[in-house]
C-alpha cells in the first residue's frame, strides 16, 4: 500500500490506496463497561429485531438468580418496553450516563431562605428553635396570587387528569388516592413505568402485556401467568390452573345478558355485586391501558362485557365501564378490546353499544378523557363513519328512510318533526356539489347520534366539510366523503362490518338510590 507525502509533511494516500470507513464511535470487541456499571437512567445499545437500538435503563432486578434490565427504546412507543438479559446489551459501545437535573427554582428559593435566615439571625429576631410552621410567601409572587390555603383557581383545573411538573407522587400515595369518581391515574410514571409480567396465557391465547398491572408480587417472578377466560382468576403455575379448571363451572360473565345477536353478546355487571370478578377484569385490562389505574374501587361502576360464543362458553372479547352517576356526562370510563381480538372490528362495536345505551337513556355522551392512543383512533373512526353515513343519507332521503327507519322514529319522537326548528339553534345547510339539499342543526345531529356537539364539530372539522358561506354554515358532501360512504356501505353489504341491532337490546336504565351511590370505604 503506497503512501505519498504532501508539502506539509502529512502522509496522504495514493489513488489506488484502500481507505477504511468507520463510525464516529470506534467499535471493537473490547468491553467498555460491565453489568455493575449499569444504573437506572443510563442509556446503552440493546439488540432488538436484529439490530442495535438506543435504550434507557428504567430498572434492574434479580430474577431467578440472574440480573435482568427493564429498558425503554428511544423514540418508540412505551408498550414496546421490555425486560432483557445482559446478553442482549452491546458492551462494546460507550455507556451514556444519566444527566443530573437541577431545579433552578429550588436553588433560588433555597438561596433566598438562607439569606433571610442570616438577616434574621443578625437582627436577633430568630432563636435557636425553628418556628416556621407556616411557609412565607415568595417575594416574586404577584399580588392576588392564590396560596395553598386559598380557594382553588377554577381556570387552572387539570380537567384531563394529566400530570404536571412537580406533581409527582409515590406509588403508595397513588394507590391511596385512587379516585372515587372516574378512573384516571394520578401519576403515570411511578405506577405504570415498569411492566412486571412477561407473558399472560388467557384461554387459548398467549398475550404479551404492554404495561404494569398490580398483580401479586409473587406472580412477577414467573415467566408466564395463567388466567381463566371465564372467571378471570389468575395462577402462577399450570398445575394450579388446570386443577382450578376441572372444578370451575362458570361459562359466561356473572351478570345479566342484555344483548345477543349472531356474533356477539353483551352482559351488564354491577361492580358492587361482583367485586372479585370486576377487580380481576381491571387487573387484566391494566396490562394494556397505560393511563388508567383503577383496579380496586369498582363499586361506583357498571361494567358492560362483550363476549363471543363457542362450544365451551362465552369468552370475553372486550368491555367498557361507566360510572353509575357521572357528573361530567361521560358514557364510558374505561374501554378495552383485548389484544388477541383487536383489528377485527370489535372496538367499534363496543363504542356503538355505549351510544346505544345513551340513546335508551335519552342522553348524549362522550368517553372520559384522556383516551389512549388506540382508543382515540377507534373513536375518531366511529365518529367519522357515523356522521358520514348520517349526512349522506340525510342528503338523499331515499337512502335515509331505507337504512335508518329507527333514527327517523327517534327524531320524530324527540323533536316532533324531522325538519330543523326555526332560528336560535346552530344550523348547517348540507350541499352536494352545487345542489342544496336540506338543513340540519348540530343539536339535531347530536339528538340522532347521541354524540356531544363538541365531538360532532371536532369530526366535521377533521373531515374539512364544515364551511362558512354567504353568512351561514354549510356542510359540503365532497367526493372524498362520498367515497368513504360507498366503502362503508360495501363493507356492510359484504358483511365485513358487523352492525348491532337496537331491537335486540333488552335493557332498562338502572336506577340507584342515594344510599346505593354512597361509596363505602
From Swiss-Prot:
Where N6-acetyllysine occurs, the residues are 292
Keywords on this record? Answer: Acetylation, Activator, Chromatin regulator, Chromosome, DNA damage, DNA repair, Nucleus, Transcription, Transcription regulation, Transferase
SMART domains annotated for this entry? CHROMO
Q: Which GO terms describe its biological process?
A: DNA repair; DNA-templated transcription elongation; positive regulation of macroautophagy; positive regulation of transcription elongation by RNA polymerase II; positive regulation of triglyceride biosynthetic process; rDNA heterochromatin formation; regulation of cell cycle
Q: Which residues form the active site?
A: 368 (proton donor/acceptor)
Where is the Tudor-knot domain positioned along the sequence?
A: 39-90
User: Which residues are involved in binding acetyl-CoA?
Assistant: 333-337, 342-348, 372
Q: Write down the top EC class of this protein.
A: transferase
Q: How is it modified after translation?
A: Autoacetylation at Lys-292 is required for proper function.
Bias regions of kind Basic and acidic residues — which residues? Answer: 101-113
Which regions are flagged for Polar residues bias?
A: 9-20, 403-418, 426-436
Specify the signal sequence span.
Answer: none
Q: Where are the zinc fingers (C2HC MYST-type)?
A: 225-250
Residues carrying the site annotation Important for catalytic activity:
334
**InterPro entries referenced in this protein's UniProt entry, alphabetically:** Acyl_CoA_acyltransferase, Chromo-like_dom_sf, Chromo/chromo_shadow_dom, HAT_MYST-type, MYST_HAT, Tudor-knot, WH-like_DNA-bd_sf, Zf-MYST
- Relate the protein's function as given in its record: Catalytic component of the NuA4 histone acetyltransferase (HAT) complex which is involved in epigenetic transcriptional activation of selected genes principally by acetylation of nucleosomal histones H4, H3, H2B, H2A and H2A variant H2A.Z. Acetylates histone H4 to form H4K5ac, H4K8ac, H4K12ac and H4K16ac, histone H3 to form H3K14ac, and histone H2A to form H2AK4ac and H2AK7ac. The NuA4 complex is involved in the DNA damage response and is required for chromosome segregation. The NuA4 complex plays a direct role in repair of DNA double-strand breaks (DSBs) through homologous recombination.
Instruction: Supply the name of the protein.
Output: Histone acetyltransferase ESA1
Report the source organism. Debaryomyces hansenii (strain ATCC 36239 / CBS 767 / BCRC 21394 / JCM 1990 / NBRC 0083 / IGC 2968) (Yeast)
Amino acid at each position: 500500500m503506497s503512501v505519498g507525502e504532501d508539502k506539509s509533511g502529512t502522509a496522504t494516500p495514493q489513488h489506488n490506496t484502500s481507505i477504511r470507513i468507520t463510525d464516529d464511535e470506534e467499535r471493537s470487541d473490547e468491553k467498555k463497561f460491565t453489568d455493575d456499571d449499569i444504573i437506572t437512567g443510563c442509556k446503552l445499545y440493546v439488540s432488538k429485531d436484529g439490530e442495535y437500538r438506543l435504550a434507557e435503563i428504567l430498572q434492574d432486578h434479580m430474577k431467578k438468580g440472574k440480573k435482568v434490565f427493564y429498558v425503554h427504546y428511544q423514540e418508540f412507543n412505551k408498550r414496546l418496553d421490555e425486560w432483557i438479559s445482559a446478553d442482549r446489551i452491546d458492551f462494546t459501545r460507550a455507556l451514556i450516563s444519566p444527566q443530573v437535573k437541577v431545579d433552578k427554582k429550588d436553588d433560588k428559593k433555597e438561596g433566598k431562605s438562607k439569606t433571610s435566615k442570616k438577616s434574621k439571625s443578625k437582627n436577633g429576631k430568630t432563636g435557636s428553635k425553628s418556628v416556621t410552621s407556616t411557609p412565607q410567601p415568595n417575594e416574586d409572587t404577584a399580588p392576588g396570587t392564590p396560596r395553598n390555603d386559598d380557594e382553588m383557581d377554577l381556570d387552572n383545573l387539570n380537567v384531563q387528569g394529566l400530570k404536571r411538573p412537580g406533581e409527582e407522587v409515590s406509588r403508595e400515595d397513588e394507590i391511596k388516592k385512587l379516585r372515587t369518581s372516574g378512573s384516571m391515574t394520578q401519576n403515570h410514571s411511578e405506577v405504570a413505568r415498569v411492566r412486571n409480567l412477561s407473558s399472560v396465557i388467557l384461554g387459548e391465547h398467549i398475550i404479551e402485556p404492554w404495561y404494569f398491572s398490580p398483580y401479586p408480587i409473587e406472580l412477577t417472578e414467573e415467566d408466564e401467568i395463567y388466567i381463566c377466560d371465564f372467571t378471570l382468576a389468575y395462577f402462577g403455575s399450570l398445575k394450579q390452573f388446570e386443577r382450578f379448571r376441572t372444578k370451575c363451572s362458570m361459562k359466561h360473565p356473572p351478570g345479566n345478558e342484555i344483548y345477543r345477536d349472531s356474533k356477539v353478546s353483551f352482559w351488564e355487571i354491577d361492580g358492587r355485586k361482583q367485586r372479585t370478578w370486576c377487580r380481576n377484569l381491571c387487573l387484566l385490562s391494566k396490562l394494556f391501558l397505560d393511563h388508567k389505574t383503577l383496579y380496586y374501587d369498582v363499586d361506583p361502576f357498571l361494567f358492560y362485557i362483550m363476549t363471543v360464543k363457542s362450544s365451551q362458553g362465552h369468552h370475553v372479547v372486550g368491555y367498557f365501564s361507566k360510572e353509575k352517576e357521572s357528573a361530567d356526562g361521560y358514557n364510558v370510563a374505561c374501554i378495552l378490546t383485548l389484544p388477541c381480538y383487536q383489528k377485527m372490528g370489535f372496538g367499534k362495536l363496543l363504542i356503538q353499544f355505549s351510544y346505544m345505551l345513551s340513546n335508551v337513556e335519552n342522553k348524549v355522551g362522550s368517553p372520559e378523557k384522556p383516551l389512549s392512543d388506540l382508543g382515540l383512533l377507534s373513536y375518531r373512526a366511529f365518529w367519522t363513519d357515523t356522521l358520514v353515513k348520517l349526512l349522506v343519507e340525510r342528503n338523499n332521503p331515499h337512502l335515509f328512510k331505507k337504512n335508518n327507519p329507527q333514527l327517523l322514529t327517534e327524531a320524530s319522537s324527540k323533536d316532533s318533526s324531522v325538519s330543523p326548528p326555526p332560528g336560535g339553534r346552530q344550523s348547517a345547510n348540507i350541499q352536494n356539489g352545487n345542489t342544496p339539499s336540506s338543513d340540519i342543526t348540530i343539536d339535531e345531529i347530536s339528538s340522532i347520534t347521541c354524540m356531544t356537539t363538541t365531538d360532532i364539530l371536532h369530526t366535521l372539522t377533521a373531515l374539512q366539510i364544515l364551511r362558512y358561506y354567504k353568512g351561514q354554515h354549510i356542510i359540503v358532501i365532497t367526493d372524498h366523503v362520498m367515497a368513504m360512504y360507498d366503502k362503508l356501505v360495501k363493507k356492510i353489504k359484504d358483511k365485513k362490518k358487523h352492525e348491532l341491532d337496537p331491537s335486540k337490546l333488552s335493557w332498562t336504565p338502572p336506577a340507584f338510590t342515594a344510599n346505593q351511590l354512597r361509596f363505602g370505604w
